[in-house]
Amino acid sequence: MRPLTADLLLRAYASGVFPMARSRDENRLYWVDPEQRGILPLEAFHVPKSLRRTLRSERFDIRCDTAFEAVMRACGEATADRPETWINEQIIRLFVELFELGLGHSVEVWQDGELVGGLYGLALGAAFFGESMFSRRTDASKVALVHLVARLRHGGFRLLDTQFVTEHLKQFGAQEISRAAYQDRLADALAETAWFDRNATVAWEVALV
């Protein structure tokens, strides 16, 4: 693979492919273009009732884009249920560049001044590419996802790409679509303009359909 730059990374995402490392300690990256692509339809997002109680409790403080690299590094940490991750130093470096360009974004969950959950991704046009999430408290990553969807709906986004579908995401309505169907949705989203306003106050209820 040729040396990966932020510009090349943007062109890759715009064409429907994304990079991964086999492990966080491996320097090489490879391109991924799944036959079945995971998406989370913004118009059919489901918030489980039990999670709504957590959201209403306001036990967490939600911030955007205040600790982008810290979120990435937390997503790249090994955990009991995720002993290996694909986020290596090259990916972190490139996404930090995209963050500095205003294209990378993080949704962060804080509790008592401690970063306890969050997610990060990339915004292009009206498409948002969700990369990874982490949780150090019960429901923290789920709360981050709900707040992400609320912000995306508020900003006029059309596509939330999750790359793959996990059991964690299925409860929110994530689904797999064919590569061809994904390319159609991606093209439509890239042709439009949306706005990820990191400073806006957006209630989580905006995520509700």
Swiss-Prot record:
Belongs to the L/F-transferase family. GO terms for biological process: protein catabolic process. It catalyses: N-terminal L-lysyl-[protein] + L-leucyl-tRNA(Leu) = N-terminal L-leucyl-L-lysyl-[protein] + tRNA(Leu) + H(+); N-terminal L-arginyl-[protein] + L-leucyl-tRNA(Leu) = N-terminal L-leucyl-L-arginyl-[protein] + tRNA(Leu) + H(+); L-phenylalanyl-tRNA(Phe) + an N-terminal L-alpha-aminoacyl-[protein] = an N-terminal L-phenylalanyl-L-alpha-aminoacyl-[protein] + tRNA(Phe). Its EC number is 2.3.2.6. This is Leucyl/phenylalanyl-tRNA--protein transferase. It is an enzyme of class 2 (transferase). Gene3D superfamilies: Leucyl/phenylalanyl-tRNA-protein transferase, C-terminal domain. HAMAP family: Leu_Phe_trans. It holds the Pfam family Leu_Phe_trans. It is found in: Cytoplasm. GO terms for molecular function: leucyl-tRNA--protein transferase activity. Its main location: cytoplasm. Keywords: Acyltransferase, Cytoplasm, Transferase. The keyword Oxidoreductase does not apply. PANTHER family: LEUCYL/PHENYLALANYL-TRNA--PROTEIN TRANSFERASE, LEUCYL_PHENYLALANYL-TRNA--PROTEIN TRANSFERASE. The lineage of its organism: Bacteria, Pseudomonadati, Pseudomonadota, Alphaproteobacteria, Rhodospirillales. Functions in the N-end rule pathway of protein degradation where it conjugates Leu, Phe and, less efficiently, Met from aminoacyl-tRNAs to the N-termini of proteins containing an N-terminal arginine or lysine. GO terms for cellular component: cytoplasm. The keyword Transmembrane helix does not apply.
